[in-house]
Amino acid sequence: MLHTTQRLCCSAHHNNNDFLFMRVITGTLKGRHFDVPRSFKARPTTDFAKENLFNVVRAYIDFEDDCEALDLFTGTGSISLELVSRGCKRVISVEKEPLHYTFINKIAKELKAEQWLPLRGDVFKYITRCGEKFNFVFADPPYALKELATIPDLVFEHNLLKDDGLFVLEHGKDYDFSEHPNFVEHRHYGSVNFSFFKNKGEE
């Protein structure tokens, strides 16, 4: 159960020189905002890109139907908060950067969001050791990450998706996953690109 004491956002609005202003788009936390320090390496997905992303995702996933989600490279926590707000049964967020992890863990505690579990650790190690399956997996690695292109293969090699699950990877314009055997579709909103993947045989 959520008891909201603050508000969050996911766009690149500015409220002063030290913070980025971020907002939850939809759900029980709609309109809530948080200030994200500009000193963070991670930057939130824009409102425009995020809203369009979830408009596509909801055609594949019913978040309120016992949905279990995994958010990799969580960053500021904006996607995880959308998942919590939209009614996911459980949300696991994996983030290696200590400042980012502390930030999202504090938010989860302040919201008393018992279904939200932030974890601090290396995403690649987590994938290999996870042993669980999810309805929805999202990954937003740094665009310059040299291992970025390997992430879809790792997700499917380690069976992170349930049979009808969906994996979405956010990436820069220089990547093309259309030949990947699990690729479903690609969307781009400004400079933000999303590639969608499902298990073979799932449409």
Task: Pin down the residues of each PLM region.
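Class I S-adenosyl-L-methionine-dependent methyltransferase catalytic core
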Residues: L2-E203
